[in-house]
């Protein structure tokens, strides 16, 4: 861990000044992470060698350049948010045996997130305003011809047009049905932006599942055009699990900003031990469906192990919501003491700020006009 963090610290303290330096830095960082993964996280060299690491690195770099070219006003955090969805789509491409690449649909759908998701999640914007925007967006997704109301809508409609250029509405109706499903889920999820609700007043679990599931289901259709029933079931479940992880990590922020999740509802009424255990079991059940993809069992095991570690780390970072006994038991399954991870994380934040800066340093600089070195 220390070796890996040292490489991260060097990268952030001395940002690369050319593409050649960046690639060398990325190679050193990758080598340090491989040592960390093998010696501490419990992965084998054979498992890691099965991952298309270089392809993911290249496609991430390209995504950032294209996003900057599409809208120079996008912030690093916006691109990071969009990139997270693109990485999910790229992962599905790999699982489906497709080339790992930024297709027009993957690029467009991923960029829709900073333009729409943040807008709809903003508690300062009146619900009526969001509803009006949502209806116009729905009409455009449904293929209705209408002129954009403002510059923001123009950008959003242009992104929808990118998807239409790749997929014919006639030949690939499921693609656009999936987009309407995630749009409907986003609209319905506005009911979650409230500080409290009487029992049964808001279907928090159902709305959360729908929002997460439809998001990754759309990724699946956008990367392949069609899915088997088993693949559809897995991608929907994957999206739910990812949503639960996000909600578990954001308990404090969601509580402060008045967003209902199954975790904020339970927080303050006792420990979340039981709810966290159910989240573990749910994730393992979903990931058992990985056999719908033609990938080697060591890869499936790597994904399952990675999901467990991610959930353990998330709980360790929000330890105030759990009992001491539960945390001690969970820590036995962590490669690091929670106190050590917290110390390292706090030190990183003091020195460098958020993890978004790491992405900006390793990727965003390559889109800068100041970088002249083609090598």
Regions found by a protein language model. Name each.
Residues 145-174, 272-317:
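Primarily interfacial, aromatic-capped hydrophobic alpha-helices that serve as membrane anchors
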Residues 1-55, 91-142, 220-234, 238, ...:
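Acidic, metal/ion-handling microdomains and their immediate structural contexts
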Residues 112, 150-163, 201-209, 256-267, ...:
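Short, surface-exposed, charge-dense and proline/glycine-enriched linear segments
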Residues 211-214, 239, 302-311, 322-332, ...:
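Alpha-helical transmembrane segments of multi-pass membrane proteins
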Residues 41, 52, 63, 276-279:
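Hydrophobic face of amphipathic alpha-helices
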Residues 50, 57-105, 109-112, 118-119, ...:
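All-alpha helical catalytic cores of prenyl diphosphate-utilizing isoprenoid enzymes
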Residues 43, 317-318:
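Amphipathic alpha-helical coiled-coil segments
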Residues 3, 7, 24, 28, ...:
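Exposed alpha-helical structural elements
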């Amino acid at each position: 861990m220390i070796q890996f963090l040292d490489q991260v610290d060097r990268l952030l303290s001395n940002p690369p000044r050319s593409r050649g330096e960046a690639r060398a830095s990325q190679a050193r960082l990758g080598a340090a992470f491989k040592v960390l993964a093998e010696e501490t996280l419990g992965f084998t060299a054979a498992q890691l060698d099965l991952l298309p690491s270089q392809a993911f690195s290249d496609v991430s770099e390209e995504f950032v350049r294209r996003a900057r070219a599409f809208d120079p006003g996008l912030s690093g955090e916006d691109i990071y948010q969009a990139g997270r969805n693109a990485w999910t789509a790229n992962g599905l491409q790999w699982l489906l045996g497709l080339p790992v690449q930024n297709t027009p649909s993957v690029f467009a759908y991923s960029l829709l997130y900073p333009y729409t998701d943040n807008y709809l999640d903003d508690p300062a914007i009146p619900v009526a305003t969001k509803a009006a925007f949502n209806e116009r967006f729905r009409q455009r997704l449904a293929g209705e011809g209408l002129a954009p109301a403002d510059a923001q809508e123009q950008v959003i409609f242009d992104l929808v047009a990118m998807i239409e250029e790749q997929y014919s509405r006639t030949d690939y109706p499921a693609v656009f049905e999936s987009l309407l499903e995630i749009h409907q889920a986003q609209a319905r999820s506005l009911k979650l932006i409230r500080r409290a609700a009487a029992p049964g007043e808001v279907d928090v679990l159902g709305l959360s599942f729908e929002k997460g599931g439809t998001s990754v289901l759309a990724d699946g259709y956008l990367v392949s055009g069609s899915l088997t029933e088993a693949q559809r079931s897995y991608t929907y479940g994957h999206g739910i699990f990812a949503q639960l992880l996000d909600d578990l990590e954001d308990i404090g922020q969601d509580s402060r900003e008045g967003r209902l999740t199954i975790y904020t509802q339970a927080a303050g009424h006792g420990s979340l031990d039981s709810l966290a255990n159910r989240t573990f079991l749910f994730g393992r059940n979903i990931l058992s469906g990985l056999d719908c993809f033609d990938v080697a069992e060591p890869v499936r095991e790597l994904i399952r192990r990675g999901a467990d570690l991610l959930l353990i780390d998330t709980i360790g970072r929000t330890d105030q919501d759990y009992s001491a006994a539960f945390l001690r038991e969970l820590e036995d399954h962590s490669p690091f003491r929670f106190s050590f991870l917290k110390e390292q994380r706090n030190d990183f934040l003091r020195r460098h700020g958020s993890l978004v800066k790491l992405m900006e340093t390793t990727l965003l600089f390559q889109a800068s006009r100041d970088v002249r070195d083609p090598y």
